[in-house]
Amino acid sequence: AKDEGAGTAVQGGNLVGTYRLIRQDVAKKHGGFYSESEFDLAPLLQRHSHLKFLEVGRSCVAQGFRGKPVAELLWQGIWNYVRYHKLDVMLGCASLEGVDVAALSDQLSFLAHVSPAPAEWNVTALENHKIDMQRKPMSEVNQKAVLKNLPTLIKAYLRLGCYIGDGAVIGSGSTITKDV
């Protein structure tokens, strides 16, 4: 794994997991954050112009290594990267499997209700992509079933205290993307 900005690389051993990370200063030189193709980050970045942001993007872990130990090592590496570069805020997208909004209405509603971003931290999906997440009242959501079926990564982000922005996006392929 290599940090193009710092010119560092991991030597030797087997690479079994990785995350796509991009610092704000690097993103500015290369057309912005990936998330900006689906979410309006400009107001957030302007409100917090004194802070340094890191986008946490796609993760990939080799088959046979997917589990808590490798996830913890990846997050330890991310935390070391955050400290090394003196970063303040992490942002990014996470995906739900599938593109059938009706079938995902419980999950979308749960996320919208359980961890909404306060106004100063909120981001909104771009209008031409935006799907309303508040599909039903929380009283109609089977929370136990949702928690069982949410992707592990989204559950981990919730445990870490993430905020959920306003709106979801049907991504390219077979997922609905949610900004966290």
Model-derived features with residue positions:
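Acyl-donor binding region in acyl/amide transferases
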Residues: 23-162, 168-176
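A short beta-strand motif that forms the metal-chelation/ATP-contact edge
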Residues: 178-180
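Active-site beta-strand termini and strand-to-loop segments that position acidic
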Residues: 2-4
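Conserved beta-strand in the GNAT
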Residues: 8-23, 55
